[in-house]
């Protein structure tokens, strides 16, 4: 459709990467990309293949690229009153917090170990995870 012009000539392409709250909390707060010194910007981590596909679809070089975002939420000064340093340290905010580690890694219907979700629990341990190994992995010093 693009190549034969049946939908006209594309002038711009807007692409959005929607990362679920529990996915973001795992990958960019607790997970492999939690440290900007050791990882890549989110646009490279989440969108490099998207950009390849867009380049192929457009059959043209990109002239402008914009990415928006900053560390504005997961900071110590934004923590709720009564929050512990770590979720598993008896956090007073556990029940109302959507980012609670036990919810994300054990009970969340999309990501929880107890629901059979697989990822992200299966990347926290070297061996196939058990509840004990997941709790141990989540308690590794910051």
Spell out what each predicted region is.
Residues 1-137:
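Predominantly a Rossmann-like dinucleotide-binding segment in NAD(P)-dependent oxidoreductases
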Residues 138-142:
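Glycine-enriched catalytic-core subsegment of oxygenase/oxidase enzymes
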